[in-house]
Every structure is written in C-alpha cells, then in structure tokens.
C-alpha cells in the first residue's frame, strides 16, 4: 500500500497543496514551524478520522477559512482508492471512499493503515498507563472491527455504570445488569490485548536485538487485575460484584480494561522507571516497527510509515538501521537536518523542501 497523491485545501497552514509521492521514501526537510508535521497529520487523519495532535477539528482549518479538505489517492492490493475528507468549522466532517459517503467515521478505520512515530510517542513508554491503552486501542481497532465496536460499547456501559455509582445510594443490585455487560465486552477487549501483546513481544524482541546489536532483549507484559485468564469473563464479573460497595464509595469503576496497562522491560528491567532516554526512545521505535509487521502479517500489506522528526534524535547506527529497514514500503519522513539518506537508499528517495506552507522538490 502506498499514497500516490496528496491534496490539501485550507488545512493548517496550507491554502492549496498537491503532491505526487514516491512509492518508496519521501523526505520533507525544513525549519521548525513551516508545515512539515501538518503533512503527516493530514495523512494520519485519513487513516483513523482524527488528528494525533488535537481533539478539536476546527484547529485543523486554516485561519479565516470555513472548512478544510484532505484527499489521498492510494494504491492498495493493486487497486486504487481515493479518500476525501471535508472538515467543517461547526464540528462536522464528511468522509468519502471512492466517492461513496461513509455512514460513520468508524467505517474509515482499516481502509488505509498508517503507523506514525513522533516525539509525542515517547509517552507510550514514559508516561501514565492511559497512553499505552490508547496505543493498544488504536492498533487493535485498525485490525479488528469487533474490537473497535466492543470498545465503544464497553465505554458506553462504563460511563452509565459510573453515573449510577455517583448518583444512587449504594444499591448494589442496580449495577448488576451493567456488570454483566461490562464483563462481556471487557473480557473480549482483554483477550485481544493479550494476544496483541504476545505478538508485539515476539516481533519486538527480534527487532530490538537487531537495533541494539544483540545487546538488549525487550519484553512486553500485559498487566490486568483479572487472575483467571482462562475464564476472563466470569472472573471479571465476580471482581465487579465483589468491589461494588467500594465503587459506590469512590464513584467510579475500580477494575477493568480501562485500568489495565502493559510493562515495557529491557533486560528484565522496567524501562519506564529505570530506562535511559536512549533506551526509552529505542523501545518506542521497536514498538512502532513491530506494530508495522503485525499489520503486514494480518492484512497482507505494509502500512505507510510516518516518521515525524525522530531520526535526528537517534544515534547514527539506529538511523542506519531504520533506513535499511524501510525499503519494502512507503515511508514519509520529516526533519530539520538529516544524514544524507541517499547514500543508503539510492533512487528510493524523493526529497521535498518545506517553507512556510509551500513545498518544492
């Protein structure tokens, strides 16, 4: 899968932009705040229908304009597909695939897969469990519609249960119907996360050993309050019922996939607490490259890889490793100063210069 063309109208600092991209490596170079990341953001938006930088779509619309337009023309499984998205200032958006309007934005997920690695992704390793859960939810939703719908239903039931916990007077029986639903949807979410983490560990350790010249092993472990992983639904339901009084006191649900986490261990040591900045950055790189391989395995095609100003933060050997690893699929790279990647990729590279919302080859 690769992007043939990208068009933007009134998106961020771009009034009009039309680009023909290389099926291999595309490098956008320019000073900070010129619009490099905006290009990657528009591509990411066409993958999951939201930005990786903001929850407010109106921020994507160029100042003074009423709406923004993004279009990507992609080659997928030897078939061409066109995704058109119009973002309106009032908060609405319209999405079409091959001129057919999608009923919901969720129908876009899985049509066009990307994997992005940006400086913000360090939060996956460094920050709170919510960032790791978000990573799992996005990656699994790309691959599994049932997971996405289970997640939506779980969050809806969770919000309803929490409302009851805050507003009712400790009537433990009233939550029982919600507990059945939470355990049903939540058990599926946990099962799929466990399988994904296992795949991530297998692929990730091989990649990480290659990156670190066989000096480090990496392992990912899913952390959940569920004890009986052979009977997750029943164990989860019992956990909810046993703790319902405590939940009424707190006004929130104490256990479930919304509280789960996963550990990132390098050489059996917790990377979040004890890893160096370099180890944490390499761990995220491993996670991203492993997730890319999982998508390839499950869909038959590599996604598009987006690297937003991250190469310059890696040492020369890790830069070379990435550049030697991305020959098989389309990659779009941004940076202010990069090593001469033509030396490593020959004619696989197309270079662009970005200056204040204009792009030149």
Swiss-Prot record:
ATP binds at residues 30-37. It is found in: Cytoplasm. InterPro entries: DNA-binding_RecF (IPR001238), DNA-binding_RecF_CS (IPR018078), P-loop_NTPase (IPR027417), RecF/RecN/SMC_N (IPR003395), RecF_2 (IPR042174). The keyword Transmembrane does not apply. PROSITE patterns: RECF_1, RECF_2. Its main location: cytoplasm. It holds the Pfam family SMC_N. It comes from the Bacteria. One of its GO terms (biological process) is double-strand break repair. One of its GO terms (molecular function) is single-stranded DNA binding. The keyword DNA-binding applies. Keywords: ATP-binding, Cytoplasm, DNA damage, DNA repair, DNA replication, DNA-binding, Nucleotide-binding, SOS response. One of its GO terms (cellular component) is cytoplasm. Coiled coil: none annotated. Belongs to the RecF family. HAMAP family: RecF. The RecF protein is involved in DNA metabolism; it is required for DNA replication and normal SOS inducibility. RecF binds preferentially to single-stranded, linear DNA. It also seems to bind ATP. This is DNA replication and repair protein RecF. It comes from Clostridium novyi (strain NT).
């Amino acid at each position: 899968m690769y992007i043939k063309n990208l068009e933007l109208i009134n998106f961020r600092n771009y009034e009009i932009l039309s680009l023909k991209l290389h099926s291999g490596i595309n490098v956008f170079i320019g000073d900070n705040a010129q619009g490099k990341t905006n290009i990657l953001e528009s591509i990411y938006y066409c993958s999951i229908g939201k930005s990786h930088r903001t929850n407010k779509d109106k921020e994507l619309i160029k100042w003074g304009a009423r709406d923004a337009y993004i279009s990507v023309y992609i080659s997928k499984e030897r078939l061409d597909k066109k995704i058109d998205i119009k973002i309106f200032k009032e908060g609405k958006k319209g999405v079409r695939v091959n001129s057919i309007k999608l009923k919901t934005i969720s129908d876009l997920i899985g049509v066009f897969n990307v994997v992005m690695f940006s400086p913000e992704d360090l939060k996956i390793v460094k920050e709170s469990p919510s960032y790791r859960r978000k990573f799992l939810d996005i990656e699994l939703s790309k691959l599994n519609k049932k997971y996405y719908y289970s997640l939506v239903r779980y969050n809806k039931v969770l919000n309803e249960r929490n409302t009851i916990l805050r507003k009712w007077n400790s009537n433990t029986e009233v939550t029982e119907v919600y507990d059945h639903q939470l355990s049903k949807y939540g058990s599926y979410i946990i099962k799929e996360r466990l399988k994904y983490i296992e795949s991530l560990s297998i692929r990730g350790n091989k990649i990480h050993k290659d990156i670190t010249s066989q000096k480090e092993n990496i392992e990912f472990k899913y952390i959940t309050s569920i004890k009986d992983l052979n009977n997750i639904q029943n164990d989860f339901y019992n956990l909810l019922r046993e703790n319902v009084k405590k939940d009424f006191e707190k006004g929130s649900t104490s256990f479930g996939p919304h509280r789960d986490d996963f550990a990132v261990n390098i050489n059996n040591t917790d990377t979040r607490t004890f890893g160096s900045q370099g180890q944490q950055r390499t761990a995220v790189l491993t996670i991203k490259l492993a997730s890319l391989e999982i998508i390839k395995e499950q869909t038959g095609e590599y996604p598009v890889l987006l690297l937003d100003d991250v190469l310059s933060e890696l040492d020369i050997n890790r830069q070379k490793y990435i550049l030697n690893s991305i020959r098989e699929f389309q990659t779009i790279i941004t940076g202010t100063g990069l090593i001469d990647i033509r030396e490593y990729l020959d004619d696989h590279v197309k270079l662009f210069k970005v200056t204040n919302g204009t792009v030149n080859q």
